[in-house]
């Protein structure tokens, strides 16, 4: 019987604290990786230990800037060239997720582009949390594990035993998630329907409320 392939966890510079907490929970060491920066702003990634035949988990959020995404892509490329058995990208915050559809002419769809870049780089699986839009999972031809923080948040909020608690969402896109919180906790829901004239500026806002018993 062949030996089970080992798993190894590595972190980019943007998510090292989380990776350390993950490794502590799994009782495994955080892998050694080196990121070399050059005078012109470029950087290169290298693994300081063998990952041949291992299941490699790469922890890195791709926000707030493009360097974090590029760093992850280089991590994936280096792992692929180092003969990892499989490569799993663990992206707690999936950047560019707000660009999930063509909502006006001549506009980019950043989430699809990021999905293509990760796939071409060579990931075999994606683990991410609370995507801005569920349909982003369909941008990938590989398995996507879409996790939800509600599994942690809901019991915690309930344990606080807060009075006059209301669940609110800043836009229609969050209504499904907010409704789940509202129903689970048995509290009212407030929905904000925003109107924008340009990005990052709200022209008007309508508030809708529902009682805890409403569906």
Language-model-derived ranges and their functions:
Residues 2-17, 24-172, 179-183, 189-190, ...:
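Active-site loop-to-helix "anion-binding N-cap" substructures in soluble metabolic enzymes
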């Amino acid at each position: 019987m062949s030996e089970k392939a080992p798993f190894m966890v590595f972190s980019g510079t943007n998510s090292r604290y989380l990776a350390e907490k993950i490794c502590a929970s799994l009782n495994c060491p955080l892998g050694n990786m080196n990121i070399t920066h050059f005078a012109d702003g470029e950087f290169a990634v290298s693994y300081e230990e063998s990952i041949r035949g291992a299941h490699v988990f790469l922890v890195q959020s791709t926000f707030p800037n493009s360097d974090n995404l590029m760093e992850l892509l280089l991590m994936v490329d280096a792992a692929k060239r180092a003969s990892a058995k499989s490569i799993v990208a663990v992206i707690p915050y999936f950047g560019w997720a707000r660009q999930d559809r063509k909502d006006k002419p001549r506009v980019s769809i950043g989430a699809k582009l990021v999905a293509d870049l990760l796939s071409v780089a060579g990931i075999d699986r994606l683990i991410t949390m609370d995507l801005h839009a569920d349909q982003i999972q369909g941008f990938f031809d590989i398995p996507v594990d879409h996790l939800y923080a509600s599994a942690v948040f809901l019991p915690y909020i309930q344990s606080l035993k807060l009075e006059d608690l209301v669940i609110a969402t800043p836009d229609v896109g969050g209504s499904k998630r907010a409704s789940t919180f509202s129903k689970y906790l048995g509290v009212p829901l407030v929905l904000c329907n925003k109107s924008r004239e340009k990005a990052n500026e709200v022209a008007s806002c309508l508030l809708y409320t529902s009682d805890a018993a409403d569906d």
